[in-house]
Amino acid sequence: MANLKSIKKRIVSVKNTRQITKAMKMVSAAKLRRAQENVVAARPYAGKLAEVLERLAKTQESDASPLMVKRDTRRALLVVVTSDRGLCGGFNANLSKAAERFINERKGDFSELSLMTIGRKGYEFLRNRHTVRKHHGNIFSTLSYHTAALIAAELVEGYLAEEYDEVYVIYNAFKSVMTQDITLEQLLPVTAKTADTDEVGTEYIYEPSKAALLDELLPKHIEVQVFKSLLESVASEHGARMTAMDSASKNATEMIGKLTLIYNRARQAAITTELMEIISGSESIKG
């Protein structure tokens, strides 16, 4: 009977856990819809701004703005974007390990490679392994463009002060509920891509002037790229957590089925034993 009670207690415990994982899945699904809408809205704006900036930058000298000047690379900063919370599968661990791979592969290229971590999980993983220059935590629950602009301003200020010569960001880009792609991008210095063949010969008129627009667009471009990275990470986090909680719920259901089968067999064996004892007692009385 003691064994039956322990099995029944475990079944109740797993059922309670399944209720929690199902609830977390539903919450993540609701948050994912909103986060996905934000990502879908931000991508065209970020893409078009980058396109305009690239066209403009191609017509200027590489030193037209301090943010475009490519210096002798001595120091680099890697911005690592993870989440503040867990229970989202390998979302944080995979990205933190990818950041560490980048550090190990590129550390020979720099005299110093430091980190800025956004999200508690990445900070906890990397703080004892590498130099964390700055940490931003607890920003995702109230994430806004203003927050991203403040972080971008820190990056630009440090770059202009020559605290670092290159800035990279690594984050999970949202592809689908099941898929998040670890993405590494260079934020600073801003570089213009090679002109597309279908744009050759096209002339654009810029007002008030190319230099003035460049000075205005470059900081805005950094802000938008940081904001997009954060939005992508938030959507990816909710997708990963939704998938993880769905898997946990299915595993719990499977475990409940197995435990129920074990319980029924144990109960049947206990009843059979009791019947045999009753029959044996009855036979001994008759004898």
From Swiss-Prot:
Signal peptide: none annotated. It is a peripheral membrane protein. It holds the Pfam family ATP-synt. Its main location: membrane. Gene3D superfamilies: 3.40.1380.10, ATP synthase, gamma subunit, helix hairpin domain (1.10.287.80). It comes from the Bacteria. It is found in: Cell inner membrane. Disulfide bonds: none annotated. SUPFAM superfamilies: ATP synthase (F1-ATPase), gamma subunit. GO terms for cellular component: plasma membrane; proton-transporting ATP synthase complex. InterPro entries: ATP_synth_F1_ATPase_gsu (IPR035968), ATP_synth_F1_gsu (IPR000131). Produces ATP from ADP in the presence of a proton gradient across the membrane. The gamma chain is believed to be important in regulating ATPase activity and the flow of protons through the CF(0) complex. PANTHER family: ATP SYNTHASE GAMMA CHAIN, ATP SYNTHASE SUBUNIT GAMMA, MITOCHONDRIAL. F-type ATPases have 2 components, CF(1) - the catalytic core - and CF(0) - the membrane proton channel. CF(1) has five subunits: alpha(3), beta(3), gamma(1), delta(1), epsilon(1). CF(0) has three main subunits: a, b and c. Belongs to the ATPase gamma chain family. HAMAP family: ATP_synth_gamma_bact. This is ATP synthase gamma chain. It comes from Citrifermentans bemidjiense (strain ATCC BAA-1014 / DSM 16622 / JCM 12645 / Bem). The lineage of its organism: Bacteria, Pseudomonadati, Thermodesulfobacteriota, Desulfuromonadia, Geobacterales.
